[in-house]
Every structure is written in structure tokens, then in C-alpha cells.
Amino acid sequence: FSKKKIEAYCEVEGLNGIAIDYNRFVDVILPTTLWPKYGIVQDQEYRQWDFGYHPAMIEKFKAAYGYDPKEQEDPSQDGKWLQFSCDQITEVANMIADVVHSYGKKMAASPFPTPKMASKMVRQDWGKWNLDIVFPMVYHNFYTEDISFISDCMIEDVRDKNPKTTLYCGLMVADDIENAMDAALNHGAEGISIFTVSALRTPESRAMFKAYADSVRAVRAENNGVNPALSKSTKVTNPFESMDILNRINAKIKELANVPIP
């Protein structure tokens, strides 16, 4: 069914490519900001939230490995079961990519932030997908993270993506959007995708994004198409070396200092 749909889309005159979204399992682990909405805590994998235990999946896994993952004490710790689940999603992505490429068109996708996170949360091992362009959804606010989350994700994505895939960074528009774009472009992203289009509808927002894009193009033109900041892109593992984290700590201290002591 999916293959025939993609073939039909690829035959549309003037279409340059196909971008897939939601090629994944239902969230095994939700972003932290959504836990209160559903009244749950997902500090680890819980079987009741993993919808990968479909009878057909179980039978296919048993045929390959000779045992039922459900019979284990904690199936979430079974590397074979995790990789098997990821491979089912990868198979669909690459089937679509094969069709798209057979028509000479570009293949793109919008997965979760990094292959490692995406594999754990929704079984998207997207570093193995045959993509021309990837737009990982690096919405730091969804994970109650600061701007450093974007930098770290980009460094990880550059390392783990398919070498043939061009990396963009998907960002949700917020007050700190310019800092977010800086973090993405300075740590490996070759471009930015913005969610949602409604954030681009005011003259002021369009002017801001245009000015930012023009400035990035100018910097790259002066440096043979390369962003000079990339040469110093390293993931910060010491929290006391991260200005974003230190600023949040200072803000929290100030907040607590204003709380009256009972």
C-alpha cells in the first residue's frame, strides 16, 4: 500500500522529493513536558507503553531468534529485541527511499533529535536510513532543556547520521530562536527548518529570519562555504563549563532567594 502511494506521489509533475514524518512506533518514552498531560512518569521503558509487541512482530522475532521477548524479565534490556524493532522502521524508510530515488527525486525525513534518542523513544534508528536530507526535531523545550541540548544533538547527529545525508536542524520558534539557530549552525547543521509556518507570518518575523539567513550566507561566503565555528565544535560534558547550565542555576538561585522562609 505505502509503496504504491509513494509511486503515485513521485509521478506528480514538478515534485522534487518526498519527506516522511511519523515513520515510527508510538512513543515508548514521551518527552518530559508531556508526562503531566497524561499523568505518567516514564523515567525508563515500561512495557505498557511499548506498542511494538504486536503478535506479527513477536512471531517474526521468534522465527529469527528462537524466543519470545515477552517471556524475559525485562524485554527493554534485550539488545536484539530493540534492534529488531528499530529494523522494522528502517525497512519501511528505506523501501520508501528506494522508490523515491528510482524516480530521481530527493528523500527526506523528520525524526526525533538523534539516532540514539530516537531509537530509545520511538525505534527510529535513522542513522541507517538512506536519506538525502534529514530534519531532526530538536525541540529543546519539549525536553525541558536549554540551548546546549541543540549543540549536543548536532554534534551527535554529525557523528551518527548516514554519511550521505545532509543535516538540517528542526527548531520550534521561541524567544531564543536566534541563539538556537546559532547553536545548530555552529555545531554541524547545514541549514535550519522552522516549526511552525504560523511563526513566519508577521512582517517582523520574516524580516528577522531573512536578516539572519543573509548574515549566515555572508559568513559562509567569506570562509569558502564553511561556518568557521565548526572547527571548535565539541560536546561539553562538564556542566560547570556550560554557560547555559550555569545561567539556569543562577536564575534558580535568584528565584529561591525571593521565596519567603516559613
Where are these regions (language model features)?
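Generic structural signal for well-ordered alpha-helices
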Residues: 6-7, 90-97, 151-159, 181-182, ...
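Hydrophobic faces of well-ordered beta-strands that scaffold small-molecule active sites
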Residues: 18-20, 107-109, 134-136, 167-171, ...
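Conserved, mostly hydrophobic/aromatic
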Residues: 100, 134, 184
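Acidic (Asp/Glu)-rich catalytic clusters
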Residues: 125-129, 157-162, 184-186
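Substrate-binding cleft of secreted/luminal carbohydrate-active enzymes
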Residues: 138-147, 168-231
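Catalytic-face loop-and-helix region of soluble metabolic enzyme cores
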Residues: 150-151, 159-173
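Mature N-terminal, pre-catalytic/accessory segment of carbohydrate-active enzymes
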Residues: 229, 234-250
